[in-house]
Amino acid sequence: MKDHLQFYIDGAWVPASGGRTLEVVNPATEEAYARIALGETADVDKAIAAAKRAFERFSRTSRKERVELLESVIEVYKKRYDDIAEAISDEMGAPMSFARQAQAAAGLGHLSEVLRVLRDYEFDEIINETVVTREPVGVCGFITPWNWPLNQIGCKVGPALAAGCTMVLKPSEIAPISAIVFTEVMHEAGVPAGVYNMVNGDGPTVGQALASPP
């Protein structure tokens, strides 16, 4: 059984603040094959604080910088494609062919489409005599489900990066391994510290902390 007992906060893998853990079960074999740490409110607070700090700089990046960043994420995603598919197969109990051809492909498809749109997206628009400027809104909190995990992550993380937002992700605690691999992708791709953060945990604790008013 492999342990994944750290969270990704402010550009680094850090230990969980508490001692709670959860076994990850492959539904096809009904056997536990990995173990994750379950986060606490303190972990979420650290991740949000890191995202807020990073927003001050990342929100001012140019379209060119964000295009280059997304290109890097996609390049590393393709390099880790088989690892992502294997993680999805194990955590969902899905056939490897389905994990490769559909599940992992969905995440890549979202990132690629976001990149395509970003290249020509008009952040400033003239309406009559008014200039409307679309600006990054701030820190995004993402809570994603177990089904189609990389599809759900890709369609949230990609647009946030393109818009210049920073983020904290809480993947499903019953299908978290593909999110961990994706986080490794983000790190290797050179996403600036604090722009993307990931905290594993359950809904009543991590989910509630992430969804509560600031």
Model-based region annotation:
Residues 1-35, 68, 72, 122-143:
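Terminal low-complexity tails and localization/encapsulation signals of metabolic enzymes
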Residues 13, 55, 146-148:
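Signature tryptophan residues that serve as conserved aromatic anchors
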Residues 25-92, 118:
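N-terminal alpha-helical segment of soluble enzymes
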Residues 42, 79, 83, 94, ...:
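Short alpha-helical
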Residues 71-81, 94-121:
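Long amphipathic alpha-helix in the N-terminal Rossmann-like dinucleotide-binding domain
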Residues 87-95, 102, 125-129:
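Short linear capping/connector segments at secondary-structure termini
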Residues 123-214:
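Rossmann-like NAD(P) dinucleotide-binding subdomain of oxidoreductase/dehydrogenase enzymes
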